[in-house]
Regions:
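Class I S-adenosyl-L-methionine-dependent methyltransferase catalytic core
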Residues: 1-188
Length: 188
């Protein structure tokens, strides 16, 4: 895995061999960021990637956050509850010189607290497939007021999973790649 674009373009991202870890592929990450930067649905909203604060739920290796930071995002909060993956996140952040732009919380992505009253412009939600965690994690973000009015939520789910619907969100774009479905939402 590597950073696709921005100030750290071409730098490698470390992962681990673990059957429970499913890092987003370079191709899928590139597609998501092309939509975030060039997609007409996103351009017509008030969202901009540059300077945004993001939250990465089920952060894994942190590759999504590191790609966003390389492309000009301001700060990232990564939520991950696997200690081995948290070590990988810190190794990657150190290697990419992003330690001062990230915060990592070892907490459950479906119930963590926003003690610092952070507000986010971008949320990336990539729960383990087949565990029905998407709705709970996104509802936690909404319930605790963690999203700015112009926030974009990117949800990755397995294609065969029943699509998540949210009364508080508008689905503005979907993209299927391989076995993954990417849904882009904004607050209503």
């Amino acid at each position: 895995m590597r950073i696709i674009s921005g100030t750290k373009k071409g730098h490698s991202i470390t992962s681990i061999k673990n059957s429970e870890v499913r890092p987003i592929s370079d191709k899928n990450r590139e597609t998501i960021f092309n939509i975030l930067v060039h997609g007409k649905e996103i351009i017509n909203s008030d969202f901009t990637l540059e300077g945004c604060n993001l939250i990465d739920l089920f952060a894994g290796t942190g590759s999504f956050s590191f790609e966003a930071l390389s492309r000009g995002s301001h700060k990232a909060l990564l939520i991950e509850n696997n200690n081995e993956m948290i070590d990988v996140i810190y190794k990657n952040a150190k290697k990419l010189d992003f330690l001062d732009r990230i915060e990592v919380k070892n907490q459950n992505a479906c119930s963590f607290d926003n003690d610092d009253n952070h507000k986010f412009d971008l949320a990336y939600v990539d729960p383990p497939y087949g565990k029905n965690l998407a709705k709970r994690s996104i509802r936690n973000l909404i319930k605790k007021g963690m999203l700015n009015d112009n926030a974009i939520i990117v949800l990755e789910e397995e294609i065969k999973t029943e699509k998540s619907n949210f009364d508080e969100l508008e689905l503005i774009r979907e993209k299927q790649i391989g076995i993954s479905n990417f849904s882009f939402y904004k607050l209503i």
